[in-house]
């Protein structure tokens, strides 16, 4: 994604693994980051996924509105500002769950994990095969970690985030 609202993204003719698996009866979900376009037609739920809960940009794009130099004009924000964390479904429902600001970045992967686990539970209860694509935000530079992860590695914030990621996924 070049800039928010750009008309570039995954194309309708691009076949995804989710599309192929859905044709075989799988429940398909993507949770976490997705960088294949931010307009609704580019959301994973338009490309084979039953459910998507995640962010659409590299992390520093999402924290830009917190910068004191970021334009405060509402028209600018409406046209060029990043979308919030999106929860969408194959039936066309799309909800903006709020901005991915610096504070939320500390724990957003826990939100994504919880949503992925709920998806898996529902598929298991329905005795349906499933495919989950989980993309945490932790391995980005710059990342924001919660206080509890500071110093875990003894090698700086990036490696602390990696230890936090390892703890998240097991």
What kind of feature is each model-predicted range?
Residues 1-170:
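Formylglycine-dependent sulfatase
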């Amino acid at each position: 994604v070049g800039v928010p609202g750009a008309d570039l993204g995954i194309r309708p003719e691009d076949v995804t693994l989710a599309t192929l698996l859905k044709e075989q009866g799988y429940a398909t979900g993507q949770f976490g980051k997705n960088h294949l376009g931010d307009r609704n037609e580019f959301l994973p739920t338009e490309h084979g996924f039953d459910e998507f809960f995640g962010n659409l940009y590299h992390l520093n794009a999402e924290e830009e509105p917190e910068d004191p130099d970021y334009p405060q004009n509402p028209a600018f924000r409406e046209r060029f500002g990043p979308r919030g964390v999106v929860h969408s479904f194959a039936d066309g429902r799309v909800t903006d769950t709020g901005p991915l600001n610096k504070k939320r970045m500390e724990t957003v992967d826990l939100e994504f994990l919880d949503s992925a686990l709920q998806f898996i539970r529902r598929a298991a209860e329905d005795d349906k095969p499933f495919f989950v694509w989980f993309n945490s935000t932790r391995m980005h530079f710059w990342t924001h970690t919660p206080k509890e992860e500071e110093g875990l590695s003894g090698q700086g914030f990036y490696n602390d985030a990696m230890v936090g990621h390892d703890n998240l996924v097991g």
